[in-house]
Amino acid sequence: MQENQQITKKEQYNLNKLQKRLRRNVGEAIADFNMIEEGDRIMVCLSGGKDSYTMLEILRNLQQSAPINFSLVAVNLDQKQPGFPEHVLPEYLEKLGVEYKIVEENTYGIVKEKIPEGKTTCSLCSRLRRGILYRTATELGATKIALGHHRDDILQTLFLNMFYGGKMKGMPPKLMSDDGKHIVIRPLAYCREKDIQRFADAKAFPIIPCNLCGSQPNLQRQVIADMLRDWDKRYPGRIETMFSAMQNVVPSHLCDTNLFDFKGITHGSEVVNGGDLAFDREEIPLQPACWQPEEDENQLDELRLNVVEVK
């Protein structure tokens, strides 16, 4: 009995610590990009995956202590995929007491009709889904649309565009929608996917898999995701450093003439951002920028539990 109590305390301690980190990450992103303002009505797009469940949970948590007032309405798009468990999300949201709307649109049928067997469905599916969500936001009077993309998604998009699109373009934490009528926010922009996964596992969210894209092998995004996970294991801190680089762009030291007036550089021009250091010896720090070793949570847990036992 005592052992079971210790396990429960350990799990609760880890969950509390993890939730605080996620809450801090979301709070910082909201503040840095002014994502949520007084009186906002946030349409939280809920797919049934770990990311959107976590986003809703953290936003609900922040709502209780935020210095501003804002409301949440969860929206799920039922795309009429075969075997989609229609009861799961309504039951979950009613239990939470969260306002919600289920939008039923047979985008699955459209995708299957338009896309040849074996081809990637993501692009068409995303466009259809986007249009429906924009329309729903208008109907609900939502001032912001919240999507569940996290830090890893943002980095993956950056590399996808570099490797396959030939451009430095990521996934912005806040943007104007394609139709120019809605503001889209990504509150999980600073959150690590592995933290979200651990949180979702601990909370035992009723996950609904995507039968359209989740079962498609060899997607380019999956290749990039595997590469980043490998780097994260072999080179601790590299992911943090790359994300930090996205927040510290130096246009004068790239090659885009739209971002910097290279033609305007003449004799007598000011030195910009340190000038050219190409011939200087590079001073590389021993540890990547913005990296901190992860806490040994097992040791912390054991220490805390031992203190509890002594008392």
UniProtKB/Swiss-Prot annotation:
Annotated pathway: tRNA modification
Names of the cofactor(s): [4Fe-4S] cluster; Mg(2+)
Compartments, record wording: Cytoplasm
Motif range (PP-loop motif): 47-52
Main location: cytoplasm
Domain of life from the UniProt record: Bacteria
GO cellular component term of the entry, any: cytosol
Catalytic activity: cytidine(32) in tRNA + S-sulfanyl-L-cysteinyl-[cysteine desulfurase] + AH2 + ATP = 2-thiocytidine(32) in tRNA + L-cysteinyl-[cysteine desulfurase] + A + AMP + diphosphate + H(+)
Enzyme Commission number: 2.8.1.-
A Pfam family reported for this protein in Swiss-Prot or TrEMBL: ATP_bind_3
Enzyme class: transferase
Extra remark beyond the main annotation: The thiolation reaction likely consists of two steps: a first activation step by ATP to form an adenylated intermediate of the target base of tRNA, and a second nucleophilic substitution step of the sulfur (S) atom supplied by the hydrosulfide attached to the Fe-S cluster.
Name of the protein this chain belongs to: tRNA-cytidine(32) 2-sulfurtransferase
Organism expressing this protein natively: Escherichia coli (strain K12)
Gene, per the UniProt record: ttcA
